[in-house]
Amino acid sequence: MRQSLALCLFIAGSLGAAAIGSRFMTGEWYAGIVKPSWNPPNWIFGPAWTLRYALMAVAAWRVWCRAGFGGARGPLGLFAGQLALNAVWSWLFFGRHRMDLAFIEILVLWAAIFATLLAFRRIDRPASWLPLPYLAWVAFAGVLNGTLWRLNAG
């Protein structure tokens, strides 16, 4: 029962971070900027991010199950930090329309996700595999962010 409740809390926390970030999503500004031909359709972002946040939550939960909060303070701190960075990216990109700062921030976010993955690996190897789609998506999002910045500069 305790583990099930903890899993629900990890998922709720992750989806809470997603909800904060989604407050700044798309809208007229994004619809009006120049996009590359390979830009994904808007409808894909919601389901894709939800799945990735859920996988990250399960990974963090697995780490907690193996080491507890005391034994996994560092890895779980990294987990919380990268969730916060993800929300900041949404605010910079969609809320402030600062593609330049968002690009720099997404590089930091990617590094934070990678550090989280490595920290999880020391405690629970399968937990380090679950964030791989998230890491790949953020790499893609970084390339897209950089391309959008270049196409819309000036």
Language-model segments: residues:
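Membrane-helix boundary connector in multi-pass membrane proteins
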Residues: 93-99, 115-129
